[in-house]
């Protein structure tokens, strides 16, 4: 549903059906899972039908985790294939 391309040409995609966030580096033929990918869930670094994503000015990634009624914030290593690190949780009703 949601796609973001950063200044370096890296593509970030919400994969709602598989409950994960994917990343493709510029000119890469394959992507990697940076958040989720462990099945549906409500634990940190798990998602339940993510819907949107956005970076802030500091490079933190915010993911709207629809079925868990929350927004998760992750610190992302943009220079390697390291997965995102869970930082904060915002709950909403």
Question: Where do the protein language model's features map onto the residues?
Answer:
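Short loop/turn segments immediately following the C-termini of beta-strands
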Residues: 16, 26, 66, 76
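Conserved beta-propeller blade signature
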Residues: 11-12, 61-62
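Structural signal for beta-propeller blades
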Residues: 19-22, 69-71
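Gly/Pro-rich loop segments of beta-rich domains
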Residues: 1, 27-54, 78-93
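Cysteine-rich, disulfide-stabilized extracellular repeat modules
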Residues: 7-9, 17, 30, 43-49, ...
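Primary detector of tandem Cys2His2 zinc-finger arrays in metazoan DNA-binding transcription factors
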Residues: 12-14, 21-24, 28
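Residue-level detector of Asp-centered blade-edge/turn motifs that repeat once per structural unit
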Residues: 5-8, 55-58
């Amino acid at each position: 549903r949601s796609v973001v391309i950063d200044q370096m040409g890296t593509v970030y995609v919400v994969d709602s059906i598989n409950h994960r966030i994917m990343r493709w580096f510029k000119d890469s033929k394959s992507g990697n899972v940076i958040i989720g990918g462990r099945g549906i869930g409500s634990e940190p670094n798990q998602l339940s039908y993510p819907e949107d994503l956005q970076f802030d000015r500091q490079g933190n990634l915010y993911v709207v985790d629809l079925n868990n009624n929350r927004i998760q914030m992750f610190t992302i290593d943009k220079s390697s294939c390291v997965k995102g690190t869970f930082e904060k949780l915002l709950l909403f009703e």
